[in-house]
Amino acid sequence: MFKAIKRGLAWLWKAFCYTLGVLFVVLLLYQGWFAAHIWYWAGHNPQSTSFMQARLERMREKDPKAKLRQQWTSYARISNELKRAVIVAEDAKFSEHDGFDWDGIQKALEKNQKRGKVVAGGSTISQQLAKNLFLSGEKSLWRKGQEAIITWMLEVLMDKERILEIYLNVAEWGNGVFGAEAAARHYYNVSAAGLNADQAARLAAMLPRPLYYERNRDSEFLQRYSETIRARMPSAQLP
């Protein structure tokens, strides 16, 4: 009887180890899929992102012929003013950290705890790019964990300049308006290279709520925030 129990336990242990091994291999292949895309995009421009496709689907629920406006622009042809403005507004330590701004995360947690609700995120440009490229808007521990892994991959497989270049080309600036070139032409009828400091500051200020600010361009808060960004832009460190 004891031998039978022992054999049964041994079988269960082997089955458990086998299942665990299979799950590990599946997880490894899953992460490899992300890594392969990031490695490829280090030298090639992504045609679209998960976030862009989700936006297009929502737009086509109202208009089946809806299209996104985006025109890829190289890092060198994007105004340095816009680069500075976005870094100041979204991730002041972008050139210094490894993808995670731990001080910023701590401050965001303290601010949220004080307010009793989520009022600050603390996400870096690399983290935002990870979400935009691959992930849905779902909020879960699994998604946050996957975001962290993808962020780490971005930082390992790309340099900071490439991360910022992709971010500036896939960021949303209005309903169906993606990337610096489309945003510059949509709001100011200039190229991304031709944006001045004031225009760049205003575009950067729109990033947290682009759909809202596209409809409310005279927002007093948007104006004040733009002025704050403009004043801080000289301190931005470009990669």
Model-identified regions with their sequence ranges:
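Juxtamembrane regions of bacterial inner-membrane/periplasmic proteins
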Residues: 2-239
